[in-house]
Amino acid sequence: MQMSKRELLLKKIKENNGIITTKEALNLGIHKDILKELTIKEELEKITNGLYALPSENIDEYLYFSYRIPKGIFSHETAAYLQGLSTRMPLVYVMTVKVGDNVSRVKSVRDNIIFKYIKKDYYDIGKITITSPFGREISVYDKERTILDMIKDKDRIDSQVFSEVIKSYFAGKEKNLLKLSKYAIKMNMEYALKQYSEVLL
């Protein structure tokens, strides 16, 4: 027996951990009108343009910002928390985007996000995918890239958070100093890194 459009849609949402985009629905042959109808019936909740979720679903900020800024990468203090280098849960999230990326729509509706702009040559250095604390895949910078970002942006970052992150990394067993050094060379940060590594190693 063939599934109805509604059943097909709900099946896809369950596979997607409780969310679906308009694009994904259209790819299944499900028109926007069906999404609208289910929203009116309160079987779905519209999170933002193009993103829907089950009413019971907890839409976390990591998911929201990842959807609104698909090319954004969680970085700095946010990456440090996600990587276990900081115990300070972010109240304001930090994302890195390429110079020229338009994030004005998100900035106009959310005041808990900081965007850092980077040259495209540095954008992919250390980019990885991890599972967020809420169980969904998100883009984030690895520990080594995060250390360099923190050093570069030291004047903006809370001194206690900065100190915790730097000390946690250099005292940790998972540090990769070769990778850190390679990143520093690529990002022209050898001298800045040396100031900290010589003291902490």
What are these regions (language model features)?
Residues 27-40:
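Short amphipathic alpha-helical interaction segments
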Residues 2-18:
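Short amphipathic alpha-helical interface segments
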Residues 8, 22-24, 51-201:
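Nucleic-acid-binding surface
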Residues 42-49:
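A short, conserved structural fragment
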Residues 15-28:
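Short acidic, hydrophobic short linear motifs in intrinsically disordered regions
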